[in-house]
């Protein structure tokens, strides 16, 4: 009798588990359009990097996210949506964030800057830029301004880290 009850409970558990798995796959199919990249995926150092742009102003604002910003495009949306009528807005998602690839390579300031510049070039976005760094990307911005002053028109810090 006990074995029969255990078998019944096990069958019920398996049916419930299968129902949850089926529901999960159905929801994934329904949500598939929501997982499409919001910007364009460009190649930088052999990997895909996400670059989002909108607006058509004369000046280009490039938003750079800090550490641990999982989706920079969505994170900055409340700000850039107010500015896109007057400026060209660009949001670069670093490797490992948003829709960009996760890579296994050094993430020092020089390589992050190199990847950002490569992504901007691949997306056909030319300077000079108004860089809008948040948090840790402030270090990358100062490094960029030192190495490539002709590419930086201005820096507008968004609670950025400074050396």
Identify the meaning behind each predicted range.
Residues 47-99:
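Conserved HGGG/HGGXW glycine-rich cap/lid loop of the alpha/beta-hydrolase fold
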């Amino acid at each position: 009798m006990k074995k029969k009850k255990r078998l019944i409970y096990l069958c019920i558990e398996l049916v419930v588990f299968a129902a949850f798995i089926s529901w999960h796959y159905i929801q994934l199919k329904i949500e598939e359009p929501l997982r499409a990249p919001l910007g364009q995926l460009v190649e930088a150092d052999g990997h895909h990097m996400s670059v989002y742009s909108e607006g058509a102003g004369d000046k280009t604002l490039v938003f750079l996210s800090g550490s641990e910003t999982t989706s920079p495009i969505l994170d900055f949306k409340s700000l850039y949506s107010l500015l896109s009528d007057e400026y060209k807005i660009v949001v670069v998602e670093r490797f490992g964030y948003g829709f960009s690839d996760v890579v296994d390579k050094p993430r020092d300031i020089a390589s992050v800057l190199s990847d950002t510049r490569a992504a901007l070039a691949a997306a056909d976005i030319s300077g000079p830029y108004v860089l809008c760094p948040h948090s840790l990307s402030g270090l990358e911005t100062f490094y960029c301004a030192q190495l490539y002053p002709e590419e930086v028109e201005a820096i507008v810090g968004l609670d950025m880290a400074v050396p």
